Amino acid sequence: LPICANGSTNCHQIPLDDLFERVVKLAHRIHSLTSDMFNEFDERYAQGRGFISRAINNCHTSSLTTPEDKEQAQKFHHDDLLRLVMKVLRSWNDPLLQLVSEVPQGIGEAPGTILWKVTEVEDQTKQLIEGMEKILGRMHPNGLDNEVLSLWPMPMAMHAGDGSKLFAFYNLLHCFRRDSFKIDSYLKLLRCRLFHEGGC
């Protein structure tokens, strides 16, 4: 479901709390899809290969300082959390584009469910970025310092051996599952903090 059903020009007519509700639902949907996709890939391709031990702390977004749990996130000002959500989201533009283009070639026998989910996640992440940009524009009409970082170091080595290709896919899915959970959690906390009285 698009953040702004009648196009971006209609966003100014939607209450800010409603916009926030929409991005929270979209972020949760993305995390759910990503978790399903990772679990399917893990079960089908990664069993017995020891990928998880190699994937820990091997994400291209690891250089970003992010709160690890709700208690840590509570210590962040809401503007800092908004900036962080945008940094993490934008850092996934290139990796998701490559996943969409490379999965059919890199995993020729990949089931249609994985191919569909990769495309769906990439499309919905674009929608989420658009929704967050609308929210930031409403909350900070004069702009919010939000530099765009290029954290994606290089394309995956798609012509390497099968094990290396599979690990490259596994690692990306593992990392996006981790980051999509953080985005989902931070947005739920922000919604609660900004619009719900009585504490979070």
From Swiss-Prot:
Positions of disulphide bridges: C4-C11, C59-C175, C192-C200
Tissues expressed in: Pituitary gland.
Localization per Swiss-Prot or TrEMBL: Secreted
A biological-process GO annotation: response to nutrient levels
Molecular function per GO: hormone activity
Keyword entries, A-Z: Disulfide bond, Hormone, Secreted
Gene Ontology annotations for the cellular component aspect, listed alphabetically: extracellular space
Keyword Nucleotide-binding in annotation: no
InterPro entries: 4_helix_cytokine-like_core, Somatotropin/Prolactin, Somatotropin_CS
Major localisation: secreted
Recorded family membership: Belongs to the somatotropin/prolactin family.
Name of this protein: Prolactin
Organism: Protopterus aethiopicus
